[in-house]
Structures are given as structure tokens and as C-alpha cells.
């Protein structure tokens, strides 16, 4: 999957996904944890206000693709790469100012448990930045197709779930949802097109 990841997203990035990443990450700063950075498509969008960036990528093939991008940007701010996953996140409580997740929570074993871990490692007032594809509940026909295809899709696409309601799970994990935009991710199959993106805060 790592070998074809960037090629798979070329058209999607050009059709607006790259702009979404830039807008989401342009205002983050301080100590940042990104879970599941994959090949590092977010790296170019982190601003100089970041003082420390930890990239938690459990897939060794993704880490191999990530390494040269990290090396190219390491002079901007300290970057650490770890093989950590989210079950649990191996950092102390209240360790980070920001946690970033883009197209990750669809494929973790338990997205609700992952959100609780994200909440735990954020400092009070910290920001959770997210971009995730979700269940197309507003389109019954498409939602039925998601349900039918999901068992095979998970096996083909690295445990990617099509029917998760991550937009509902975020506030359920204790976050204050500040911004959540629901929009179609162009140049993708219809079953993964509906997305939610924005940010939520850990209450002070």
C-alpha cells in the first residue's frame, strides 16, 4: 500500500485535498503529534510556529517513504519519527498542544478508543485537527453500498472502514467541536467521498 499511496492521491490532492491540508495545518503551533502520517503528505504544510513535531507511524513501509521527506524538512523544527500506534498512544497525559489526524481514524482498530487516547495526550485547551472520510448517512443508497462493500474494502485497503461516524465520535470522546465542515473529497470513489474536517478543543 505504501508503494502506491502517493500515486493514488495525486488527482485527489490536486482537486482540493492539498488545499484542505494547508488550511487545517496553517495555524497550528507548539508541540504537535501527528498520528498515522503515512508518507508525509502533511509535512509541507506545518508552519514555523511548530516547536516539536512527533510523527507516529506504525507501518514500516510508510516510514520508509516518510524518511526522505522528514530529512528534507528537519531544519525547520525538531521532527521525531516513532513506530507508535494509537492503542495506546505511548506518551504521558497532557504532552501535546495539537494532535493531527488526516485520513487515519478510518483504519485504526477502534476509532472511539483512539479518540479517547488523543484526548488524554492533549493539554487542556489543546487542539485536535482532523480530516476523515465518514459514513454517507445523508445518502441512503450510497450508505447501503458502503455497508455492502466494507468487508472486502477493509481487506484491500488496510483495514479502512467505510461506515464510521467519526464526526459523532469526536464530541462523544469529550471534545468541544469548534469547526466541522462536511464536504465531498473530489477525485475519489463515491464510497469514500464524504468527509468531515475541522478542529475540536480539549476543554480547559
Regions found by a protein language model. Give the residues of each.
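A short glycine-rich, Lys/Arg-flanked "PGG" loop and its adjoining helix->strand segment in the class I
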Residues: 112-124
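C-terminal alpha-helical "lid/dimerization" subdomain adjacent to the S-adenosyl-L-methionine
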Residues: 8-11, 131-192
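Class I SAM-dependent methyltransferase SAM/SAH-binding core
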Residues: 33-88
Amino acid at each position: 500500500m505504501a508503494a502506491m499511496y502517493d500515486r493514488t492521491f495525486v488527482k485527489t490532492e490536486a482537486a482540493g485535498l492539498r488545499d484542505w491540508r494547508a488550511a487545517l495545518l496553517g495555524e497550528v503551533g507548539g508541540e504537535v503529534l501527528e498520528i498515522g502520517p503515512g508518507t508525509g503528505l502533511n509535512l509541507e504544510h506545518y508552519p514555523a510556529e511548530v516547536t516539536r513535531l512527533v510523527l507516529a507511524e506504525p507501518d514500516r513501509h510508510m516510514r520508509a517513504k516518510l524518511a526522505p521527506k522528514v530529512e528534507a524538512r528537519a531544519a525547520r523544527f525538531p521532527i521525531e519519527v516513532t513506530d507508535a500506534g494509537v492503542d495506546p498512544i505511548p506518551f504521558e497525559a497532557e504532552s501535546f498542544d495539537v494532535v493531527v489526524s488526516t485520513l487515519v481514524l478510518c483504519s485504526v482498530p477502534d476509532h472511539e478508543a483512539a479518540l479517547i487516547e488523543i484526548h488524554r495526550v492533549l493539554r487542556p485547551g489543546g487542539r485536535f485537527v482532523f480530516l476523515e472520510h465518514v459514513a454517507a448517512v445523508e445518502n441512503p443508497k450510497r450508505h447501503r453500498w458502503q455497508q455492502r462493500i466494507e468487508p472486502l474494502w477493509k481487506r484491500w485497503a488496510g483495514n479502512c472502514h467505510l461506515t464510521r461516524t467519526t464526526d459523532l465520535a469526536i464530541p462523544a470522546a469529550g471534545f468541544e467541536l469548534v469547526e466541522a465542515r462536511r464536504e465531498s473529497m473530489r477525485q475519489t470513489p463515491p464510497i469514500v467521498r464524504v468527509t468531515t474536517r475541522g478542529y475540536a478543543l480539549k476543554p480547559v
